[in-house]
Each structure stands twice: as C-alpha cells, then as structure tokens.
Amino acid sequence: MLTPAGQRRLMELQASGGDFGDTGKSFAGATATVVIVTRTEIYCANAGDSRTVLSRAGRAKEMSEDHKPDNSGELARIQRAGGFVEEGRVNGMLALSRALGDFEYKGSPNLAPKDQVVSCFPDIRIEQIDASVQFILLACDGIWDVKTNQQAIDFMMQKLYKGNFSNTRS
C-alpha cells in the first residue's frame, strides 16, 4: 500500500515541477498502476488510465478507475484548478486526468499537487483474498481500448488453462 510517507514523497517529486537539475525540465508523463499482495489482501494504487482487474471465480472485478477528464469528479477538479475539458481531453490536449509528470498541467503554485489540473494522487483500493481469487491483470489503455474487463479476463483464463502463451504479446 502507498503509505503516508510514500504519498508525501510522491507529492514532493511532483512539486519539484519536473526540474531535473542539469538535464533541464521534463514535460513527459506516465500512468502508474501498482499492486501489492499480502497473505490476506490485495492493494491497488492507480493514477492514470492503466487499469488493474482481478479475476475472482472467473468474473472480472475492477480494482482501479480510469482517470479520464470527462469523469464528473475529475472534471470538477480540473475546472476548479483553472483547466477545461475539450473533446475528452484536458485543455484540449491530454486524454487522461491523472499522471506522474506532465508538469505543464501542474504549474499552479497555490494548489497542492493532488489538486492541480492533472493530479498525481492515486486512488487506492483494497480487496480481500479468498479461494475465489485466481489472478490479477494489469494493463495499459491499449488493451482496455479494445477489450472489456471480462473479455480480457476470459482471454487470460483461456491462455492460463491451456498453458499456451506462445501467441500472446505483452
């Protein structure tokens, strides 16, 4: 789980505004979906439009939310921060509303990193582990643009139970 200390460090890194010293300022960005599994629980932290889906008895259980600009909560934060959404994109450009980096959307000195036009603050979800948990699938938006959660789980179950990943690409 992203501890309070880990959350603070993430916020500090984002607050640096992408200043990497001698190498200059970076405007690149990335999504992150992270899973930690203990004996009894699965923790998922997500920022962006990568997604984590749990297979529980063959049924897809979404463990993360896609952070898209047209989501009502994300849209409200973007607008409060002085941004706008046009054609499903932050300020008409970025197709997601949370990310690491993308510092050109995080320049308001009066706002905390989690309240910027594009936030770095992850959602965190927890699921209990029981005998019905089979596997966890983490993938980028390229998969989710063409497969539903259940289709992706069905595909993976078919490959797992056949033991055949030779034609599978990551």
Predicted regions and their residues:
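PP2C/PPM-type serine/threonine phosphatase catalytic domain
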Residues: 1-170
